[in-house]
UniProtKB/Swiss-Prot annotation:
The record marks 160 as: Transition state stabilizer. Its EC number is 5.3.1.23. It comes from the Bacteria. The active site is at residue 240. Keywords: Amino-acid biosynthesis, Isomerase, Methionine biosynthesis. One of its GO terms (molecular function) is S-methyl-5-thioribose-1-phosphate isomerase activity. This is Methylthioribose-1-phosphate isomerase. Substrate binds at residues 51-53, 88, 199, 250-251. It catalyses: 5-(methylsulfanyl)-alpha-D-ribose 1-phosphate = 5-(methylsulfanyl)-D-ribulose 1-phosphate. Pfam families: IF-2B.
């Protein structure tokens, strides 16, 4: 997508090195940084210089490629898989991308691994862009149907950032929105701030503003109120891991939005790229590990000071503890449908397997 009219991806190669947008500084500062070592790739994923399941996977793939150029030995391959895999436990794309790289590289002689790894990492990025473009095309049909029925503006609520900053390009939940904008449909987006890291306020709002999408930032607890009063036509969220039966693990607070949508008859859709499906897991609540992050993310907020610097400010009393689960699981029964690159389906095993029979068979 574009920043000030210039096309960008969230991760790319330039002058022989991998570069990313360091998202910790957005929206107040655009910092582009190189990643040159395995340690830097691990830090970028773990400390959320990059975030979003698809982008985490793409970053891990490039981390493997850079390490193979440094040391293509069997020991290095195994250690790099482990180091990168341990950075974020919830997002399934991380494991998927690392397994893709390991399957490709393990049978090859070390002398061939660096070139093969770089090719595959680039392919993973290009594949992600195409997957998200197709998700947008399918999701556009939902938005168009509402626009034709209402004969007016379509109001969409989204949670966290499932935009192009969470993928290589287009985004998942935002891709239908961008497609609708290009199609001339009048859309308005309610952006959840998404505490505690405020990815909605910091990142999604920045994306919407950069692309000229009409939007309002709302506090996390306002969504239910807006739905009660008929101000939300459609909810579209992303996912960090979706089970074989359609349970959706996404940023903390997604479950509450799904409950409110169900109670108020608002369609609740999940934009789901197929690499985010974990065909080995059936019960999301019982089986998906939920990352618990630092309590400081809850007790402190980061923002722009009057002098323009970005600072962290404590908001809770000294001595107050905080729980900080980063994700929750929305049961499939609350999901209206899954928007995938192959079409829209119900959040249930049979419908998902019908769209992706080869993936379901390989996991059986």
């Amino acid at each position: 997508m574009k920043i000030n009219g210039t096309p960008f991806r969230s991760i790319w190669c330039e002058a022989g090195e991998v570069r990313i947008i360091d998202q910790r500084w957005l929206p107040h500062e655009l910092r582009i940084v190189p990643l040159r070592t395995r340690a830097e790739f691990a830090a970028a994923i773990r400390d959320m210089w990059v975030r979003g399941a698809p982008l985490i996977g793409a970053t891990a793939a490039w981390g493997m490629a850079v390490q193979m150029a440094e040391d293509p030995s069997d020991a290095s391959l195994a250690e790099t898989w482990q180091v990168l895999h341990e950075t974020r436990p919830t997002a399934i794309n991380l494991r998927w991308a690392l397994n893709e790289m390991r399957r490709l590289l393990a049978p090859l002689p070390p002398s061939e691994r660096a070139a093969a790894a770089a090719r595959r990492a680039a392919e993973i990025c290009d594949e992600d862009v195409e997957i998200n473009r197709r998700i947008g095309a399918h999701g556009l049909t939902l938005i168009r149907e509402i626009a034709e029925r209402k004969r007016g503006r379509v109001n969409i609520l989204t949670h966290c950032n499932a935009g192009w900053l969470a993928t290589v390009d287009w985004g998942t939940a935002t891709s239908p929105i961008y497609h609708a904008l290009e199609a001339g449909i009048d859309v308005h987006v309610f952006v959840d701030e998404t505490r505690p890291r405020n990815q909605g306020a910091l990142l999604t709002a920045w994306e919407m503003n950069s692309h000229g999408v009409s939007h309002d930032l709302i506090v996390d607890n306002a969504g239910g109120h807006l739905m009660q009063h008929g101000e939300v036509d459609l909810v579209i969220v992303g996912t960090d891991r979706t089970t074989a039966q359609g349970d959706v693990c996404n940023k903390i607070g997604t479950y509450l939005k799904a409950l409110a949508a169900k109670a108020n008859g608002v369609p609740f859709y999940v934009a789901l790229p197929s690499p985010t499906i974990d065909w080995t897991v059936r019960d999301g609540v019982a089986e998906i590990p939920i990352e618990e992050r630092s309590s400081a993310e809850v007790t402190h907020v980061q923002g722009k000071a009057p002098d323009g610097s970005v600072i962290s400010v404590q908001i809770s009393p000294d001595g107050t503890g905080a729980r900080n689960p980063a994700f929750d699981v929305t049961p499939a029964s609350l999901v209206t449908g899954l928007i995938t690159e192959r079409g829209i389906c119900a959040a249930e095993a049979g419908a998902m397997e019908a769209l992706f029979p080869e993936a379901a068979r390989s996991a059986a």
